[in-house]
Structures are given as C-alpha cells and as structure tokens.
C-alpha cells in the first residue's frame, strides 16, 4: 500500500538523520522534494507502482559468502549495538500504522476476496490456520508488548557492508523495512551466519535458526543486549509471519512469478509443517543461561 510505503520511508529518513555515532552514516538519506521525501507514483488501469529516491550511500567491505566464527561473533555484537541504539532513539521517530496484525488482517481480506479465493485456491483454510496459530502464540507470549524498533527484516551479504574489523558500515535496500520487534531481523541474520552461507539459489527453510552457528551469534548478541525468554520463544512465529507476509501474500511482488510459485509451493509442503519441530527453544534458552 502506497500509504505504508510513504510512511516507512519517512521513518527511514528520520532514522538516518537521528542515528548517533557509530551508526550516523549507516543509512542513506532520502532526496527531499520541499519538506517531503521524494517519491513518484504511477497509476493506470492495470498498474499502481511507486519509487523513492535516495542519495548514494558509501560502501566498505563485503563479507565472504560463508562466514568464519570471528565474523559471527563480531556480527552478534554489532547487531546488538545497532538494535540497542535503534531502541534508544525509537521515540524520536514518526509513528507507524503498520503492524504484524494489520498485515495479517490484510492477508485475510485477500483470502476472503474473489481474487484471493482464486489466487490461493485449495490453500485458503491452511492460510487461515497459520494466521490463527500465529495469533495464539502472539497472545500467549504477549508479543504485542515487545519494544518496537526499526527493523529491515531482509539481511544478506549483498545489502550491507562492514569495516575491516567487522563493524557495521552501511546498509542499502529498504524494501521490507518496518517498525516491529527486533526479533523480526533474526531469521535472515540466521541465514547470514548459516553453514550454507549466502546463495543465489535458495529456499526459506527454518533450518538456519537451529544451527550452532546461529547459537554462537545469539550468545554474543545476548552478552551485549540481552534477549528475553518470550523473545526467544517467538522466533518460530517470526518465521511463520515471514512466510505468510513475504512469500504467500507479497511473493509475486518481490520475486519473479516462476520463483514466487516455487516458494509458495514449498511453503505449504515444507515451511509451515516444519515450524513445530524445526526450532528447539529449550536448547537456545539453556545455552543463553535461562
């Protein structure tokens, strides 16, 4: 929705200007048109498209496709510092009307529409069931009360750069930005540090959340900016939300149609069924000292 797009990029621009050192140059500044973020919207009978314009952001070093333990430890510490800094300035940011629940409400509207019944034929009931499971867990863990901070969700070694001593230097690509719990960043961070490393051909399996390499990342993150038990238990629900929102609902906007269809088929055959058994919260909690 264009209104959410405009809202998000206004927040990003304020965030870019308000982040203190060492993150004061981490994000690009938007071009401005008067007092507004410079966007352009094109609409006709078939298309409703929009873009936003940013100043260039400098790049430092890219991480290797497969990280070693030094990189993982440093990234755990760096992302903890970044999230903590974002939390400290979150009160200075414009309000956001988009939440996890409003996105799922929108998905339900689509599923209940004539278009949605055709687009998601045979899987409408499964989508409703997954939304119900998410909302039950959200209520049990009181996840709506988690602090809301700026999160970019999609992290991969192609959209941020680091210094030689693995300090976060710059980030570009803000397509999935939102104000939400810091936990929304963790599925993609688990992929960044995974044993498989960064890949050009991929699936969205839950496996990276259970790897020892991600546990190493969490330990170093937790030592700087401690996680709560409820946040750890919410990790598989963040994964569930990601599949519902970015694969099922918006997949055809972010991926080529053929690849979007592949990911959606995998969602029903593999991703959703793996949620209950693919992540051991107790193992993580014990490792973090709970």
Predicted regions and their residues:
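All-alpha amphipathic helical-bundle segments outside canonical DNA-binding/catalytic cores
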Residues: 70, 229-239
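ATP-binding pocket architecture of kinase catalytic cores
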Residues: 1-90
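A glycine-centered beta->alpha junction motif in the catalytic cores
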Residues: 47-65, 109-117, 244-259
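Active-site acidic catalytic loop and adjacent metal/ATP-binding pocket
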Residues: 136-184
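Short small-residue beta-strand/loop micro-motif enriched in glycine and branched aliphatics
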Residues: 60-64, 170-171, 198-200
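ATP/Mg2+ or Mg2+-diphosphate-binding catalytic cores
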Residues: 245-290
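Active-site activation/catalytic loop segments of kinase-like enzymes and analogous catalytic loops
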Residues: 184-225, 240-258
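A cross-family kinase active-site recognition segment
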Residues: 64-123, 148
């Amino acid at each position: 929705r264009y209104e959410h797009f405009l809202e998000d990029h206004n927040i990003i621009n304020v965030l870019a200007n308000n982040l203190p050192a060492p993150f004061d140059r981490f994000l690009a500044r938007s071009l401005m048109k008067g007092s507004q973020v410079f966007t352009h919207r094109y609409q006709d009978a078939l298309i409703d498209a929009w873009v936003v314009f940013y100043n260039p952001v400098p790049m430092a070093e890219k991480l290797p496709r497969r990280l070693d333990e030094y990189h993982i430890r440093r990234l755990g510490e760096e992302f903890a510092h970044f999230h903590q800094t974002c939390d400290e300035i979150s009160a200075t940011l414009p309000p956001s009307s988009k939440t996890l629940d409003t996105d799922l409400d929108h998905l339900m509207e689509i599923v209940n529409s004539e278009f949605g019944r055709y687009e998601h034929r045979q899987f409408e009931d499964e989508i409703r069931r997954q939304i119900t499971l998410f909302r039950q867990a959200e209520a049990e863990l009181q996840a709506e009360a988690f602090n809301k901070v700026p999160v970019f969700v999609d992290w991969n070694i192609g959209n941020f750069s680091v210094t030689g001593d693995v300090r976060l230097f710059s980030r570009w690509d803000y397509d999935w930005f939102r104000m939400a719990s810091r936990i929304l960043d963790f599925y993609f961070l688990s992929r960044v540090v995974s044993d498989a490393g960064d890949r050009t051909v991929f699936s969205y399996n839950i496996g990276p959340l259970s790897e020892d390499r991600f546990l190493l990342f969490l330990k170093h993150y937790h030592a700087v900016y401690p996680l709560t038990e409820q946040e750890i238990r919410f990790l598989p629900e963040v994964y569930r939300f990601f599949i519902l929102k970015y694969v099922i609902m918006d997949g055809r906007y972010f991926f080529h149609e053929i690849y979007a269809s592949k990911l959606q088929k995998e969602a029903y055959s593999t991703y959703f069924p793996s949620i209950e058994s693919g992540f051991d919260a107790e193992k993580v909690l014990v490792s973090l000292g709970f």
